[in-house]
Curated annotation (Swiss-Prot):
Gene that specifies this protein: FRE4
UniProt binding sites for heme 2: 323, 393
Residues annotated for heme 1 binding in this entry: 309, 379
Annotated signal sequence range: 1-18
Annotated spans, Disordered: 606-643
Keywords: Cell membrane, Electron transport, FAD, Flavoprotein, Glycoprotein, Heme, Ion transport, Iron, Iron transport, Membrane, Metal-binding, NADP, Oxidoreductase, Signal, Transmembrane, Transmembrane helix, Transport
Annotated ranges, domain Ferric oxidoreductase: 273-407
PANTHER family: FERRIC REDUCTASE TRANSMEMBRANE COMPONENT 3-RELATED, FERRIC/CUPRIC REDUCTASE TRANSMEMBRANE COMPONENT
Membrane-topology annotation of the record: Multi-pass membrane protein
Top-level enzyme category: oxidoreductase
Name recorded for this polypeptide: Ferric reductase transmembrane component 4
Cofactor(s) listed in the protein's UniProt record: FAD
Bias (Polar residues) ranges: 606-618, 625-643
Length: 719
């Protein structure tokens, strides 16, 4: 990723070094501007003596303009202060040395002289050598026409701002609810039946029984469905966007500015869709970034912001298509297509739209899942090119501020990311192969203040020639043995994790490697604020919940009033071996540990009946596309023949834990936890189906127990 970051930086640097500064956006629907332009349109059709139609150079024409401005101003109830703003508008309109040097007093003198000699507008064809008064009906029609034109110019900026404010408002509301965690108000609120019915039916559950697990239609269309909460946020945004695209266009029934209603509609719709498209840029860049201040405020997962990022990108592209189609129709009507298509801004507009389409096309779930590194490289390069073409498209028009904001957000995110990496430097990590496909990574911390909270994650770059530019997310734990060490457990899949696993295997099962670690990311969990905590861990999603168990067990052991249960679902003993030190640290703590092994080992467990829930496989590495794939467990022979694993975990080592053969029944376990008095937090990280089951069962428990405070805290992330 380092190379594509350099390319994107160079493109952004080129933007800042442009030959001429781009035009600033200004709101133009002011009385003085409407009046000046409407008066000009009415007066330019007259035949002025001596100077023809040169209104700004012929005194009677100038006096007529000033009188028209005066009538419009006082007719609308404005004061002389507004009239003087009209004088300034006329200076800029004519923009000659004479006008630029005229004082307000000189404007008033010219107006007084013109008023003294003013006459009614004559019939057409007469050579005019005196100031005239425009026909009142026509003057008002011209004024209204320009009011509509400038209104349609300005209103999209307000609409774009409202869309940004909508998402900021949602995040502030989520942040307020998060703040209530530190007050007794939330406990009272979450014990209200109405509140819990709303939570159980609308905000907690998945949309169609799936969220972490990707949906598939005809094995071609795949992707991740949002949760119901995310769906509500997206639905609110789509409703707003639809209203803003369809609401309150001001049309001119007299066709003073546009020759036909078709041209007027095409122009207004195209302009509005273009501004709304650009208004999405800051949010799109912000939501894709790792250092998103709205994520810090709201406490929402990065996964949720990626969902919003995708939908904003899709609607931005739709707006761009409408924008392009509208202006194409407009110029075809005026028969200017062959001329305008050769202009530079038009060519950059086409390039911008094509790049937006490519960004979306190469972001489909199937492509991300199978070619994630290619997707990331293309996405960054296309995004940089997209912003560059956007810049060139509007450099002589308006809307550049949206691009300024997007680039500023991108730049701040990169600076913070570099700072995070610098805090740890490039430490050398000890890598140890566990079983056939797990690698335990131990990293010494050079800084004492660097601490990973339970459930947090880091982005790791393995500094090897074949993969140093790649950056992948992994759950991180502070070592329970040495507080100056970090621990990461990764599962080898495809790509970089497979390269790392093969490297360690070639080194005899143990190796050292330089890493670049960026993080930690993710907010501190609120699980410690609940009376009871149920920790559900599946597969290689164990590190997060086990970190919670270690912290909760230490803080609650003295009081003994809390019920903390850690439920671990594994296939074989490899994951237990990888986290053996952390598991052994639970001994003597106030944590009930239940381990479900769905793969029967030859000499490791008694046979205990258990109910089933569908099982998949996940990983502490939250790889954006690969998390959705179920992975086959290695065969028993693979486990027993590999000489590179740690000493096998045995029943005697974990005598404090209760072992089960089979898969955990999440519903039954959850119902048992609900029976304990007090509030309950359910923390889950595991295979996609396991996570979705836990989410939906928790939502049902909230509905069944509307007077209890039950919260679901999910640590699984996929994008």
């Amino acid at each position: 990723m380092l190379l594509v970051h350099i390319i994107s930086f160079l493109l952004f640097f080129q933007l800042s070094a442009a030959k001429a500064p781009p035009s600033k956006t200004s709101l133009i629907n002011t009385h003085e501007r409407r009046s000046i332009y409407s008066c000009y349109v009415g007066l330019r059709k007259e035949t002025w003596g001596f100077n023809g139609s040169a209104i700004c150079r012929y005194e009677p024409a100038i006096q007529s303009m000033l009188y028209c401005l005066y009538e419009d101003t006082h007719e609308k109830g404005y004061s002389n202060k507004t009239l003087e703003k009209g004088f300034e508008e006329m200076r800029q309109f004519c923009y000659t040395p004479k006008f630029l040097n005229m004082t307000d007093a000189e404007f008033y003198t010219s107006l007084d002289n013109g008023t003294y000699y003013i006459q009614d507008q004559p019939k057409a064809g007469i050579n005019i050598t005196y100031p005239i008064r425009l026909n009142t009906t026509l003057r008002k029609a011209y004024y209204d026409a320009y009011y509509g034109y400038y209104y349609n110019h300005d209103i999209p900026y307000y609409f774009g701002g409202i869309i940004c404010a909508y998402f900021v408002g949602v995040m502030l509301l989520a942040g307020l609810i998060r703040f209530l965690n530190y007050t007794p108000i939330k406990k009272i609120m979450f014990q209200q039946k109405l509140v819990n019915y709303v939570r159980g039916y609308t905000t907690l559950p998945t949309l169609y029984e799936k969220h972490a697990e990707p949906f598939s239609y005809l094995k071609v269309i795949t992707g991740y469905l949002p949760t119901r909460f995310e769906t509500l946020v997206i639905l609110g945004y789509l409703i707003l966007h639809t209203i803003f695209m369809a609401y309150k266009y001001q049309y001119d029934p007299y066709h003073i500015i546009f020759a036909a209603h078709r041209a007027e509609v095409a122009h207004f719709v195209a302009y509005r869709s273009g501004i709304l498209s650009f208004a999405h840029l800051p949010l799109i860049v912000l939501f894709a970034g790792r250092n998103n201040f709205l994520q810090l405020i709201s406490g929402l997962k990065h996964t949720s912001f990626i969902v919003f990022h995708k939908w904003l990108g899709r609607m931005m592209f739709l707006d761009a298509i409408i924008h392009a189609a509208g202006f194409t129709n407009y110029y075809l009507y005026y028969k200017k297509w062959n001329t305008v298509r050769l202009r530079v801004y038009w060519k950059f507009g086409i390039a911008t739209t094509c790049l937006a389409g490519m960004l979306i096309f190469f972001s489909i779930a199937a492509f991300r899942r199978h070619y994630y590194e290619t997707f990331m490289a293309l996405h960054i390069v296309f995004a940089a090119l997209f912003l560059y073409t956007c810049w060139e498209h509007v450099t002589n028009f308006s809307g550049i501020e949206w691009i300024y904001a997007a680039i500023a957000i991108w730049g701040v995110d990169r600076i913070v990311r570099i700072t995070r990496i610098a805090l740890l430097g490039f430490p050398k990590a000890d890598l140890q192969l566990v079983g056939s496909d797990l690698v335990r990574v131990t990293v010494k911390k050079p800084k004492k203040f660097w601490k990973a909270k339970p459930g947090q994650y880091v982005f790791v770059s393995f500094l090897r020639p074949l993969c140093f530019w790649q950056s992948h997310p992994f759950t991180v734990m502070d070592s329970c043995v040495n507080d100056r060490e970090l621990v990461i457990v990764l599962k080898a899949k495809k790509g970089v994790t497979k390269l790392v696993r093969n490297f360690v295997e070639r080194k005899g099962g143990k190796a050292s490697m330089r890493l670049a670690i960026e993080g930690p990311y993710g907010s501190k969990s609120t699980a410690h604020r609940f009376d009871n905590v149920l920790l559900l861990a599946g597969g290689s999603g164990l590190p997060g919940p086990i970190s919670h168990a270690l912290e909760l067990g230490k803080t609650t052991a003295a009081s003994g009033k809390n019920f903390v249960q850690l439920v671990i679902a594994v296939r074989g003993l490899d994951m237990l071996n990888a986290c053996k030190k952390e598991l052994m640290a639970l001994k003597g703590l106030n944590v009930q540990v239940h381990i479900y092994n769905s793969k029967q080992e030859l000499a490791s467990a008694e046979k205990i009946s258990s109910n089933e829930v569908k099982n998949g496989e996940t990983t502490a590495e939250k790889a954006p596309s690969s998390l959705s794939n179920s992975e086959k467990a290695p065969s028993e022979s693979e486990n027993t023949e590999l000489p590179l694993s740690l000493n096998d975990t045995s029943i005697s080592d974990l005598e404090f834990a209760t072992f089960h053969v089979g898969r955990p029944n999440v519903e039954e376990i959850l119902n048992e936890s609900v029976n304990h008095s007090g509030s309950l937090a359910v923390v889950c990280c595991g295979p996609p189906i396991f996570v979705d089951t836990a989410r939906n069962q928790t939502a049902k428990a909230v509905i069944r127990n509307p007077s209890r405070m039950i919260e679901y805290l999910e640590e699984y992330q996929a994008w």
